[in-house]
């Protein structure tokens, strides 16, 4: 409670495992935002010449197939632009040359559809600080099966796992793959959220109260951290709810969710590797997710200011440096 100047108590009328939820609503310039942004800043590693390459983050992106090559690129390059040192993309063979052509800064592994894909990727897990599963993954059974096994093996190593896009399709089909993993973060849009909710609760979603529905889904998934993207981003671990209503724009270009998931890969590594007092007792997943959602919205706002309705995710990625400075270094 001492983290925030204002808190609203929500009393649950339904038999949830938590009867009282503290809702923390943040928007740029509000006292709430002013209180949580320092927690994000506390987790950001300082730039110093004493470090070696890789210490500030080695992020793995699991995704990229023949149809979808842009999404894994956006996620991987966003992680780098936020401040991770290395980004690996584990994709299918036919996607690899395309993704490599987008940027020489990415390390691209054409193994996701190989017969020994899981073993090939597992070799790299000891070197990775977080894994982002889903951007450009597609829904082929073999790719989903490989992604599932990679999630399982990442969990065994305690690696933060961010799941987005078709990775969420996998979770809706097999929730146990991530259920209860306290270093897992899901980033659904409303359609993906609805699919997850109905898969877990076996009843239609009541869309009249997104916060309560998000809390219920998080609890059903073992207090997994969720980021429900929308007009305001709702972040919850089933115990606490944060809403990021920072100004963005009306432009919703494809790919900005990949910017969010990739940057979240970096923020999650920083949050979980920070001293326990850095987040003042708040769940590191919540702090990381708030940092990533705030950054994505600020990038959208700045890009829209320059490009208007022509704004694309590439324009947003170009804003990461200045948006990061504005939010976390000013």
UniProtKB/Swiss-Prot annotation:
Binding annotation for ATP: 229-233, 248-257
EC number: 4.2.1.93
Record Gene3D superfamilies: 3.40.1190.20
GO biological process, one term: nicotinamide nucleotide metabolic process
Top-level EC class as recorded in UniProt: lyase
Residues annotated for (6S)-NADPHX binding in this entry: 136, 189-195, 258
Segments forming domain YjeF C-terminal: 36-327
Cofactors named for this entry: Mg(2+)
Catalytic activity, as annotated: (6S)-NADHX + ATP = ADP + phosphate + NADH + H(+); (6S)-NADPHX + ATP = ADP + phosphate + NADPH + H(+)
Top-rank taxon, per record: Eukaryota
GO molecular function: ATP binding; ATP-dependent NAD(P)H-hydrate dehydratase activity
Keywords, sorted A to Z: ATP-binding, Lyase, NAD, NADP, Nucleotide-binding, Phosphoprotein
Pfam families on file: Carb_kinase
Biological role: Catalyzes the dehydration of the S-form of NAD(P)HX at the expense of ATP, which is converted to ADP. Together with NAD(P)HX epimerase, which catalyzes the epimerization of the S- and R-forms, the enzyme allows the repair of both epimers of NAD(P)HX, a damaged form of NAD(P)H that is a result of enzymatic or heat-dependent hydration.
Family (UniProt): Belongs to the NnrD/CARKD family.
HAMAP family xref list: NADHX_dehydratase (MF_01965)
Protein's UniProt name: ATP-dependent (S)-NAD(P)H-hydrate dehydratase
Lineage: Eukaryota, Metazoa, Chordata, Craniata, Vertebrata
């Amino acid at each position: 409670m001492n983290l925030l100047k204002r808190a609203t108590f929500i009393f649950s009328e339904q038999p949830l495992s938590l009867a009282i939820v503290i809702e923390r609503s943040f928007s740029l310039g509000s006292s709430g935002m002013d209180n949580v942004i320092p927690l994000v800043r506390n987790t950001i590693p300082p730039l110093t010449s004493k470090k070696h390459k890789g210490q500030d983050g080695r992020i793995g992106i699991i995704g990229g197939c023949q149809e979808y090559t842009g999404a894994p690129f956006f996620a991987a390059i966003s992680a780098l632009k936020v401040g991770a040192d290395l980004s690996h993309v584990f994709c299918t063979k036919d996607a690899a040359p395309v993704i490599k052509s987008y940027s020489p800064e990415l390390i691209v592994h054409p193994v996701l559809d190989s017969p020994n894909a899981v073993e090939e990727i597992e070799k790299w897990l000891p070197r990775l600080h977080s894994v982002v599963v889903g951007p450009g993954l597609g829904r082929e059974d073999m790719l989903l099966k490989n992604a599932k096994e990679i999630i399982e093996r990442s969990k065994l190593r305690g690696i933060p796992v961010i799941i987005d896009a078709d990775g969420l399709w996998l979770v809706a089909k097999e929730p146990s793959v991530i259920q209860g993993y306290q270093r897992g973060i899901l980033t659904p849009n409303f359609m993906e959220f609805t699919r997850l909710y109905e898969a877990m609760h076996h009843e239609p979603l009541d869309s009249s109260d997104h916060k309560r529905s998000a809390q219920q889904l998080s609890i059903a998934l073992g207090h997994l951290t969720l980021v429900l993207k929308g007009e305001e981003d709702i972040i919850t671990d089933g115990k606490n709810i944060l809403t990021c209503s920072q100004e963005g724009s009306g432009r919703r270009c494809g790919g900005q969710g990949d910017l969010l998931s990739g940057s979240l890969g970096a923020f999650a590594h920083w949050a979980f590797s920070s001293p326990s007092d850095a987040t003042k007792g708040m769940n590191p997943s919540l702090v990381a997710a708030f940092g990533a959602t705030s950054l994505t919205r600020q990038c959208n706002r700045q890009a829209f200011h320059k490009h208007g309705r022509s704004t694309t995710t590439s324009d947003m990625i170009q804003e990461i440096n200045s948006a990061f400075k504005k939010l976390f270094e000013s």
